[in-house]
Regions:
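Catalytic nucleophile-loop/oxyanion-hole region of alpha/beta-hydrolase
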Residues: 80-81, 87, 100-135, 275-278
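Gly/Ala-rich beta-loop-alpha elbow adjacent to hydrolase catalytic centers
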Residues: 140, 144, 148
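Catalytic histidine neighborhood in serine/cysteine hydrolases
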Residues: 249-266
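Hydrolase active-site cap/lid region
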Residues: 153-207
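Short beta-strand element of the alpha/beta-hydrolase
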Residues: 64-74
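Catalytic active-site module of serine/aspartate enzymes centered on a nucleophile-bearing elbow/loop
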Residues: 272-301
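A glycine/proline-hinged amphipathic helix-loop "lid/cap" segment
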Residues: 1-60, 285, 296-301
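Short beta-strand/loop motif that positions the catalytic acidic residue
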Residues: 229-231
Length: 301
């Protein structure tokens, strides 16, 4: 298992926490060079939006340039389209790829498997439009990261060509809440066991927490595309990421785990700031490098 520890100073951690507190009250402005193009109904009936920086071409040239599908977080229950557009913009800015932000259905009105079905449908719609799987990268954060991992399991089981790579930040991979870090990091994170229990109850609505694909750690890991997992060392979900990365590695998969020292859940929100924080610069650089190195190989199933 390849693990990289990303160092941070106490000032870095404090700056990230401060940024997270101000995002709702003083949201950043979407940069003027951002291009937004709604794509419903061309994503299998799932709402979505192309977000591109510097007018990177989407649509007809996507098969040539490659695209990223971005799946937002929010505990399977919440969405903030403005902040999600900025997150998608940052991804496009750093990678040179158009980014498709997926507006999946939310719990509790639409519990499992609605959100997962939407992510899978959006991915398959790009294949139907002629975008090769080998030119697609899946990216998700928090609940969106969980959905990305679940989608990979569903797609592989169905024999659908898998994407070139996936990038996930702070996934919840074990909905049984069995990871030791849930208690070990209690009080050091912005999330705790009670929050996780609420999230899984709303999302699962009676579905079993010890089964895949809803709980990705309980799946089969052979044949997955290269994975980059990113997580903060103070997160209660630290071991969810560690355990999943270890399981994929043990199954012979290509996986890299980045652990950001001193960082809490949702630390990736630092990339939304108009003044880039050091952790944000590092995270975006790592993501960009990973995506640029994703093998353009034969479509894998």
């Amino acid at each position: 298992l390849n693990v990289t520890h990303i160092p941070a100073t106490p000032d870095d951690s404090a700056a990230v926490m401060a940024e997270m507190r101000t995002l709702q009250s003083s949201p950043p402005v979407l940069p003027v060079d951002a291009d937004r193009t709604p794509v419903l109904p061309h994503t299998g009936g799932v709402p979505g939006e192309w977000v591109t920086a510097s007018r990177h071409a989407a649509g007809p040239t996507a098969a040539e340039t490659g695209v990223t599908i971005y799946v937002h977080g929010g505990g399977f229950e919440y969405t903030n389209p403005h902040l999600e557009r900025i997150m998608a913009y940052r991804l496009s800015q750093m990678t040179g790829r158009p980014v498709l932000a997926v507006g999946y259905r939310l719990a509790p009105a639409h519990p499992y498997p609605a959100a997962l079905d939407d992510v899978v449908a959006a991915y398959r719609s790009l294949l139907d439009q002629g975008v090769p799987a080998s030119r697609i990268v899946l990216a998700g954060e928090s609940a969106g990261a969980t959905l990305v991992l679940s989608a990979l399991l569903v797609l592989r089981q169905a024999g659908v060509p898998l994407p070139a790579a996936a990038v996930v930040v702070s996934p919840q991979t074990d909905l049984t809440l069995s990871s030791p870090s849930i208690d070990a990091n209690d009080g050091q994170d912005v999330v705790n066991r009670a929050v996780l229990d609420h999230v899984r109850t709303q999302y699962l609505a009676g579905a079993r927490p010890d089964q895949a694909p809803q709980s990705p750690l309980h799946g089969e890991f052979h044949g997955l595309p290269p994975l980059l997992l990113m997580v903060g060392s103070k997160e209660v979900l630290l071991d969810d990421a560690r355990r999943f990365a270890g399981a994929v590695s043990a199954a012979g998969g290509s996986v890299h785990l980045d652990i950001y020292e001193g960082m809490p859940h949702a630390f990736h929100a630092a990339v939304l700031s108009t003044t880039p924080l050091p952790v944000a610069t590092t995270l975006l650089r790592r993501v960009s490098e990973w995506i640029s190195q994703a093998p353009v190989a034969q479509d894998r199933t």
